[in-house]
Amino acid sequence: MYAVFQSGGKQHRVSEGQVVRLEKLELATGATVEFDSVLMVVNGEDVKIGAPVVAGAKVVAEVIAQGRGEKVKIVKFRRRKHSRKQQGHRQWFTEVKITGIQA
C-alpha cells in the first residue's frame, strides 16, 4: 500500500514505515502530523485517485528530526571584469516517519 500526498508544494510517494524529508514544518520532534491533501492511494489492485484529493484519506506521520540540508553554492561570475560573487544556501527540512495511511 502506498499513497501520494502534497506537502510544501511538492508531491511525495510514501508507504508505511518510510522516512521522508519534507520542507520545514514548525513542529517539535516526536510530534504527530496528519496530511489531508492525499492525491492518490493504492492498495493492491484498488486504486483511488482524487479530484483533486481523495475524500477521507490521510497520511499520518511522526516527526523524527529537524535539520538543514547540504550547502548549495551560488556563483555569479563576470568575465573580463575581475568580478565574482559567491553565496551559499542551506535549506531547512523536517524528517518524518510515515506511521499510517488511511483511505
Swiss-Prot record:
GO terms for cellular component: cytoplasm; ribonucleoprotein complex; ribosome. It comes from Haemophilus influenzae (strain 86-028NP). GO terms for molecular function: rRNA binding; structural constituent of ribosome. This protein binds to 23S rRNA in the presence of protein L20. The keyword Secreted does not apply. NCBIfam families: L21. Pfam families: Ribosomal_L21p. Keywords: Ribonucleoprotein, Ribosomal protein, RNA-binding, rRNA-binding. The gene is rplU. The keyword Ribonucleoprotein applies. Part of the 50S ribosomal subunit. Contacts protein L20. This is Large ribosomal subunit protein bL21. Belongs to the bacterial ribosomal protein bL21 family. One of its GO terms (biological process) is translation.
